[in-house]
Amino acid sequence: MPYLDAAGDMRDIFAEYIHAKTLWIDTEVADYQSRQPRLSLIQVLDDPTDMSGDRVYILDVLQYPNIVAEFIQQIMCNSQIEKVFHNANFDLKFLGGKKAQNVTCTLELAKSIPYYLLPLPNYQLKTLATALCRFNYIDKQEQGSDWGRRPLTETQIEYAYLDCIYLAQVHLQLLELQVASNPDPKKEDLTALDARYQDLLTDWQLLKSEFEHLEERLKKAMQAQNVKETSVCKLTSYERQTVKVPFSELVNLVQNDNLSLDFPVTLTQKLQKDLGASWQKLPVEIEKNTYLRLSQKKNDAIQE
């Protein structure tokens, strides 16, 4: 885990990184709860097979805003290099924002995996690393430590480099899950899909029915007992207001006040019926959309 705090050394490693295909990156921020947070460290791993930390470079950029700018220009804005983060939106606040190109976020990647393949209570890096990679006893206590202090403690440095290792391993596992959850439709085994669909259908109908019934019972019970929260649920209420006006009155208002009001109106089946054949005199624009609906075939066999 090389720790670099000299501008020249950091520029040397940038020269290596511009040839990388993928970089796994994390950051540590000083004064992150203040109005002026400062980027303290940039941790970079260029070899996902490294579990020792030898290829995790810790760049101490606290006093080098110019080095951060160079990193953004040479690495973050380089579309040829994939940059992998967890919760990339946070890191990009300090590393180029919208200028950054070819960024992968493992948080968003995890969210895209169907829940049944990744049934986790949350998608924090610690949770993912434990569930997918069997990294146990991950200590995130140092995350909220003082990253503006110098020198950093050994515990802080260990925490910083380990996060890159967790990130890379989680990324690789998520890529495998992504492939598993998106098979080629042309090669799918329809017989196997049919069988699994049938297996789940009855259980799903029962579960859905019970769940919806429980929701209604909970709402009624909480209202009747004047309870706003239970250990699991929270009851909230809201009002929805709809403003309606007769169409003729709207037309009169537009004409009388000489308003410039022009927008398309969807001619529903009811409106078409009310207008009769007259609607065909209008300069309509017809949009056609195709939707697919999956339904269970009815059993035509006579049951006695």
Where are these regions (language model features)?
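N-terminal accessory regions of nucleic-acid-interacting proteins
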Residues: 1-27, 302-304
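Conserved DEDDh/DEDDy metal-dependent 3′-5′ exonuclease domain
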Residues: 2-5, 18-23, 32-166
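Residues that form generic nucleotide/phosphate-binding pockets
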Residues: 13-16, 74-75, 128-132, 196, ...
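Residue-level signal for secondary-structure boundary elements
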Residues: 22-25, 118-121, 137-141, 172, ...
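A broadly conserved detector of short glycine/acidic/proline-rich loop/turn motifs that flank catalytic sites
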Residues: 29, 63, 171, 239-241, ...
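Mixed-charge, glycine-rich, non-catalytic linkers/tails in nucleic-acid processing enzymes
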Residues: 154-215
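Extended, charge-rich alpha-helical segments
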Residues: 205-304
